Amino acid sequence: MHMNIIVVKNYEEASQKAFEIIKSLVIEKPDANLGLATGSTPIRLYELMCEDHRVNKTSYKDVNTFNLDEYYGLKHDHPQSYYHFMHEHLFKHIDIKKENVHIPIGEGHIEEDCKRYNQLLSNNKRDIQLLGLGSNGHIGFNEPGTSFDTSTHYIALKESTIKDNAALFFNGDLDAVPKSAITMGIHNIMESKHILLIACGKRKAEAVKGMIEGEVTEELPASILQRHPHVTVIIDEEAASLLTK
Ligand SMILES: N[C@@H]1[C@@H](O)[C@H](O)[C@@H](COP(=O)(O)O)O[C@@H]1O
């Protein structure tokens, strides 16, 4: 097993650690391909990147980014679209070029767009893929039961995911959360040279245990990371609390 597991005290330390990894990659390789994620977890990391860009002038002008997923049916300017999230939390604060930003399109011709995104991904291998972790073990929006062979696809969200995201982003309003999404598949995620997963808090402890100590199963999508040659997992004490080894 090639997982490098880093246990830190809390969310702030986890974000700092992840930031160090991303920053040193961008400095070493100014035209790096970054696979990016949304959700509540990377928010502090993105803040640190913006601050560092402002203060230390770390440049993203030759960086390309590829986001994991997008809700289906939200317009770009919807405040909860991932497109909007990424612009607000990261892109508008750094010197990345608009044309270097890639996010799946969550409306219109699904099949064509998935095909186009897959082509883009296979032409641009990611140097690093940032991941959060769903409380049910999903990565991107690859819900439990998704085949490990998938590339970018349309997926119906599980009840638990709708609930989690309602609580975090939609003021608890289940009806406001889109019921489906477009996501990079497990196959696309596994193509990245390095995978960096951050998980914090008690509600992730079960999934973290399965991901690291459980069997590799499509019922817990993140468990596939055990088969990747270069994975860094950053977890806080709460998320690590059920680990036995
Ligand atoms: N599609 C996203 C994932 O990319 C994210 O990693 C996960 C965890 O979210 P959070 O970081 O808010 O716990 O759930 C969301 O549904």
Residue ranges and their predicted role:
Residues 1-2, 58-129:
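Ligand-binding beta-strand-loop-alpha-helix segment within the catalytic cores
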Residues 32, 40-41, 45, 120-147:
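A glycine-rich beta-strand to alpha-helix segment
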Residues 28-54:
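Glycine-rich N-terminal segment of FAD-binding domains in flavoprotein oxidoreductases
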Residues 184-187, 191-245:
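ATP/nucleoside-binding phosphotransfer catalytic cores, i.e., glycine-rich phosphate-binding loops
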Residues 140-186:
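Class I SAM-dependent methyltransferase SAM-binding "motif I" and its flanking Rossmann-like core
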Residues 35-39, 67, 104, 130-133, ...:
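Short beta-strand segments
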Residues 1-34:
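N-terminal glycine-/serine-/threonine-rich phosphate-binding loop
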Residues 48-59, 82, 144-153, 214-216:
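A glycine- and small-aliphatic-rich helix-loop capping segment at beta-alpha/alpha-beta transitions
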